[in-house]
Amino acid sequence: EETVMDPLSVFSLLVAAIGHDCYHPGCDNATLAKDRVDIKRRYNGQSLSEMVSCEVTLELLRRSGALQSDDGLTTSQIAFVEDVVATSILSTDLSKHEENLKKNTAENAAQIVLKSADLAHFARPREVHLKWVHAAMDEQRRNTKRQVGVKDGHVDWKNQVFFAETFVLSTFATLSGNVSVGSTPMYEYAKTNVEKSRELIV
């Protein structure tokens, strides 16, 4: 089986996947900056929810005892794990999307994998994808107290297609082309969902 990741990278990625949304406030960073000025100041207004999730995840990882030099890990290996966890979590900030895709380096592989997993519902069966779409719209309505992305009780499919074409397909294409052997179906499945959503635009 062909792979581009060593076991330590895989471990780091799994930790990042578990913790990347541990401080998801249910709103975007712009709304969070307005509601939590203290967090905005703490992180200089950059990647707020991702920054908090990163800090919490690393603190829990250190407290867990999983990274101990007496368990055979070297200082450089511990630093490597913490770096991969941190950069992978921070890469899920969509405002950094273009910047992250352009890196296209071996070190960026974990970030692309995590971003793909974060957006993976676009590559799921249609009925599963629709559940995620409606859940996301409900979350936005609850937390922003306005109808975001919804018109007369229906999903704004034009906005959904724009999001997918801007963020999702490019991420999956990068995954398929540069990171993971055999991941092309994710792109094809997502493309099919996007085309079906495009048919619903009114």
Residue spans of the language-model regions?
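Divalent metal-dependent phosphate-bond-processing catalytic cores, especially two-metal-ion Mg2+/Mn2+ enzymes
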Residues: 1-7, 15-202
